[in-house]
Amino acid sequence: MEKVFYVTTPIYYVNAEPHLGHAYTTVVADFLARWHRLDGYRTFFLTGTDEHGETVYRAAQAAGEDPKAFVDRVSGRFKRAWDLLGIAYDDFIRTTEERHKKVVQLVLKKVYEAGDIYYGEYEGLYCVSCERFYTEKELVEGLCPIHGRPVERRKEGNYFFRMEKYRPWLQEYIQENPDLIRPEGYRNEVLAMLAEPIGDLSISRPKSRVPWGIPLPWDENHVTYVWFDALLNYVSALDYPEGEAYRTFWPHAWHLIGKDILKPHAVFWPTMLKAAGIPMYRHLNVGGFLLGPD
């Protein structure tokens, strides 16, 4: 029986330049890919850049550039950085590519037609840098727990994914598959999140406010929320749903991430997969932050 290994880094956000944290995760993924190739595994190593959303749009405006020109320039710097480090990836996915947009709209349509996406109004505390809403409980002294910056109170009409519907299933799946999320401390952190209602996930932004994104297939006045868009790179790069690469590699997926994006990968992504009828990834491997002397 053929041995198969699929390893991914997060796709890196292009609102800023490559940094040491990006390099650390990518070097670890490169090491794992090389080791598995040497051990006889058919191996696929994916990295890339996340190029839509409000933060990127604002960064392009601040730089005085067209958003597409801005993301082309910064994405190119990630590629050059990996070339300088000798990173031997098999594919570099960009969320502005047509192959990715096609898959995002396909999955959105599938989940929408199944009744798991609805329109509603939301008011909450929003971090522009994270591009996500937080509850009062999640804030640290009233600030974003990741960036330490003030959050904005926002109220707007969005489309929502029925994420709460899949919470009991996800709890059970994680409990029955103790090796899914590693190390164990992060698995326990996710189970603690799931012990309480997680609510539904806002998966769109009004195009009038955030014009830089993938339009919803049923409503051109809204673009796709950046996390619902970005997470699908792991299957769009494999030519989901019909590609030979998808059939071969997806059942063996190892995601490597930093702890700051644990919830999107351990809660958003599994529930999206379940709703779309896509099998779960094999492992989610979580690392901490690189800290300086201060």
Labelled PLM ranges:
Residues 2-47, 99-103, 156-294:
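Structured secondary-structure scaffolds
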Residues 51, 97, 126, 288-289:
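Positions that flank functional sites
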Residues 28-38, 60-68, 124-130, 142-150, ...:
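Short, mixed-charge, low-aromatic patches
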Residues 2-117, 131, 272:
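N-terminal Rossmann-like or analogous alpha/beta NTP/dinucleotide-binding catalytic cores
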Residues 65-214:
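Residue patterns forming the tRNA-binding/recognition surfaces of aminoacyl-tRNA synthetases
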